[in-house]
Amino acid sequence: VLIFCELGFELYRDQLNGYEFMFAFMPYMHTESLLYQRKGETQFFNQKNLYGTNPGKTKSLRNPNDTPFMTSIELTNYDKEYEMLKSMEPHLKGHLEVIQGFGRFPKRNVALGRESTSSEIKYMESPEVQKRPY
């Protein structure tokens, strides 16, 4: 999945709107590979930076193969996309921190038949952690 994800970003990155980006980005955020977590972090902030600090500005999505049926479009207001990306940032950071700390998502241990370490158990018992999926 991650190979297809990378290929897709390489080929279609400039054509993705914020919602499409978030869908395509999910494999990066949910992998237990620190390398791909970091790649995802880079992809995320590159996408967020497209919006800058003024989410109401116009953004062009260029289609390299403009035809009468598939043309480039101008998005004149994408405040909701920007807000959605902003709301995902804490989740991105949380997923990355878990992988940096444990090298895996401890909450997956039972489903994957893995034994939890004492530090993972302590982490999972934290009231704050129990409220989130990672």
Could you say what each language-model-derived stretch is?
Residues 2-134:
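Intrinsically disordered, low-complexity activation-like regions
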